[in-house]
From Swiss-Prot:
One of its GO terms (cellular component) is cytoplasm. Keywords: Cytoplasm, Elongation factor, Protein biosynthesis. GO terms for biological process: peptide biosynthetic process. It is found in: Cytoplasm. This is Elongation factor P. The gene is efp. It comes from Deinococcus deserti (strain DSM 17065 / CIP 109153 / LMG 22923 / VCD115).
Length: 185
């Protein structure tokens, strides 16, 4: 159990029957009344965000979330198959858990999966991945004062904006957090 005054950004707790991550907190001291802690939490299972206010003496149950290195193997229908890099055990994760990360995952991509007990909570991709462009229009140099861009479809199906000089079948480095082109690889 931790006191609400010990909450920090990224602290993970169990409350209201769910697993929550603290996104923001502030400690407010009223003139005559007791201090209050105003927080913002994100549900780690559904992604919903709530604001909560606690009195300074309240306690919450903290949880330990373990990060496991896993490797994406393949897509099986709608589900995604991962392998634990330590035990070589295979785990099936639903598309609701993988979310937008699927746009930048190709086979054999190593990811970090946040686990609470035996339950997977979130997937974290590497900050940058190298993917191949499978479809893009030829770059037409026209009236562009500064560098123009064009859409390019990657091998995973994601579409990113790339500079005009980038051609089809080129490997590019993409930022997985923003989905933006970084450079040729």
């Amino acid at each position: 159990m931790i006191s609400v005054t010990e909450l920090r950004n990224g602290t993970k707790v169990e409350m209201d029957g769910g697993l929550w991550e603290c996104l923001d907190y502030s400690h407010l001291k009223m003139g005559r009344g007791g201090a209050k802690v105003v927080t913002k939490f994100r549900n780690m299972e559904t992604g919903s965000i709530v604001d909560r206010t606690f009195n300074s003496g309240e306690k919450l149950q903290d949880i330990y979330v373990e990060g496991k290195k896993m490797q994406y193997l393949y897509k099986d229908g709608a589900d995604f198959m991962f392998m634990d890099m330590d035990t070589f055990e295979q785990v099936i994760l639903p598309p609701s858990l993988v979310g937008d990360a699927a746009k930048f995952m190709k086979e054999n991509t190593e990811v970090e999966v946040a686990m609470y007990g035996e339950k997977a909570l979130t997937i974290t991709l590497p900050n940058q991945v190298i993917l191949k462009i499978v479809e893009t229009d030829p770059g037409v140099r026209g009236d562009t004062v500064s560098g123009g861009t064009k859409p390019a479809k990657l091998e995973t199906g994601a579409v990113v904006q790339v500079p005009l000089f980038v051609e089809q079948d080129t490997n590019v480095k993409v930022d997985t957090r923003t989905g933006q082109y970084l450079s040729r690889a």
